[in-house]
């Protein structure tokens, strides 16, 4: 029996969170390489800690990239520009350890080189995409508000409106659902790193008035909504000084905030031959078009692959009982409409471009930027036609 009245919570972290610093560095390196050589194979991992950034991985490319320069530019743009923060773009050490892609993997993802002649998947695995009609961007409401809160904290910091904020921040939003529909925001948590000399009450009032109330619609707040602002009382030590950051540790923040499922693979630092990334983008594209076509209010798509094999080993569609047709019928329509072989995904979504640094903070999904081709809803008419609607 489905729950009829419940709270669902999602979180987001800002571009200055140490794990997100690592994601952005990995994707900035990927972009710098793709800008010169679009056939590159990139798997770039980053670790950031007090006074140091380390990049490592497997990269096969004809591009010539000055990796330390890219790393420092990302750290500067985020706002770590003072050694008092324990992490500073000008003075941090940058260490690199880069190898080439394994030839055994390469032959499986290079057209004509492996047992199968088509470009195969870069690894086995399962990937999910999700969409629902709770927001205009067809994303769950909790993660949508959570991302907007962390983005707003970045905006007021960089614009100079709240000069005492520093780059590392987090948000969390709990939404009440009744009969599977979001009706109100129950709890908002925001935490932001700050200068040591700001009074707590000044910080709290500023974050409520200039962040929370600027993001969450007034009709979703009521007298029972709870605000928790920097609930430890002090957040001066933050960023890579406060916690070691690693690429790929915020996979739920990157996707749907815990709604839907996740196959476990991270995105950042991976070129689109890695289906962890490209097939997850494709699954979102499929699910979003199904919901936009009003074939269902909610849609989850699973795609699974074998390494070196182009055709997915399985495609599953679940509409959670909200479909105008049975899920297996929508799955049949999806298989007819979308080509989910890796090379076709790359072509359909035009993924061999330096577009990835923008994805690495504030969510890979639900932001309708021109570069985010997987957010298009250009298959609606075709899907409705196939469904006979």
Swiss-Prot record:
Taxonomy, superkingdom: Bacteria
Q: Which Pfam families match?
A: S-AdoMet_synt_C, S-AdoMet_synt_M, S-AdoMet_synt_N
EC top class named in words: transferase
Residues bound to ATP are 17, 168-170, 234-235, 243, 249-250, 266, 270
Question: Which pathway is this protein engaged in?
Answer: Amino-acid biosynthesis; S-adenosyl-L-methionine biosynthesis; S-adenosyl-L-methionine from L-methionine: step 1/1
Q: Which InterPro entries match?
A: ADOMET_SYNTHASE_CS, S-AdoMet_synt_C, S-AdoMet_synt_central, S-AdoMet_synt_N, S-AdoMet_synthetase, S-AdoMet_synthetase_sfam
Residues that hold L-methionine according to the record: 58, 101, 243, 274
Q: What cofactor is needed? A: Mg(2+); K(+)
Q: Which GO terms describe its biological process?
A: one-carbon metabolic process; S-adenosylmethionine biosynthetic process
Question: For the region Flexible loop, what residue ranges are annotated?
Answer: 101-111
- Enzyme Commission numbers on file: 2.5.1.6
Sites binding Mg(2+) sit at 19
Give the cofactor binding note. Binds 2 divalent ions per subunit. Binds 1 potassium ion per subunit.
Molecular function (GO) terms for this protein are: ATP binding; magnesium ion binding; methionine adenosyltransferase activity
Family matches, as NCBIfam families: metK
- Family, as annotated: Belongs to the AdoMet synthase family.
What interactions and quaternary structure are annotated? Homotetramer; dimer of dimers.
Its protein name is: S-adenosylmethionine synthase
Where does this protein come from, organism-wise? Syntrophotalea carbinolica (strain DSM 2380 / NBRC 103641 / GraBd1)
């Amino acid at each position: 029996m489905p729950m009829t009245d419940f709270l669902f919570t999602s979180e987001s972290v800002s571009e200055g969170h140490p794990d997100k610093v690592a994601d952005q560095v990995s994707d900035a390196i990927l972009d710098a390489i793709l800008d010169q050589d679009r056939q590159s194979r990139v798997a770039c991992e980053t670790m950031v800690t007090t006074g140091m950034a380390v990049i490592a991985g497997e990269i096969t490319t004809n591009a010539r990239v000055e990796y330390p320069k890219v790393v420092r530019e990302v750290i500067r743009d985020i706002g770590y520009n003072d050694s008092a923060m324990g992490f500073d773009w000008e003075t941090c050490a940058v260490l690199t350890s880069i190898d080439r892609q394994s030839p055994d993997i390469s032959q499986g993802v290079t057209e004509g080189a492996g047992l199968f002649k088509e470009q195969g998947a870069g690894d086995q695995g399962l990937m999910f995409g999700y969409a629902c009609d709770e927001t205009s961007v067809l994303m769950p409401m909790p993660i949508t508000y959570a991302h907007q809160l962390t983005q707003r904290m970045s905006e007021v910091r960089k614009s100079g409106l709240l000069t005492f904020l520093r780059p590392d921040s987090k948000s969390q939003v709990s939404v009440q659902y009744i009969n599977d529909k979001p009706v109100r925001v129950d709890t908002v948590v925001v935490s932001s790193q700050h200068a040591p000399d700001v009074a707590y009450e000044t910080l709290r009032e500023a974050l409520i008035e200039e962040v929370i109330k600027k993001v969450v619609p007034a009709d979703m707040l009521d007298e029972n909504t709870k605000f928790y602002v920097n609930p430890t009382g002090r957040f001066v030590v933050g960023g890579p000084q406060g916690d070691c950051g690693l690429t790929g540790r915020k996979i739920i923040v990157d996707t749907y905030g815990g709604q839907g499922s996740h196959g476990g693979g991270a995105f950042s630092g991976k070129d689109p031959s890695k289906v962890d990334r490209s097939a997850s983008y494709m699954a979102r594209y499929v699910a979003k078009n199904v919901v936009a076509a009003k074939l269902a209010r909610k849609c989850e798509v699973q795609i699974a692959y074998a390494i070196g094999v182009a055709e997915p080993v399985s495609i599953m569609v679940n509409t959670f009982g909200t479909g105008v047709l049975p899920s297996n019928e929508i799955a049949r329509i999806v298989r007819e409409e979308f080509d989910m072989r890796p090379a076709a995904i790359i072509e359909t979504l035009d993924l061999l471009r330096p577009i990835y640094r923008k994805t690495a903070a504030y969510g890979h999904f639900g932001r309708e930027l021109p570069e985010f081709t997987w957010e298009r809803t250009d298959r609606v008419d075709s899907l409705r036609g196939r469904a006979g609607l």
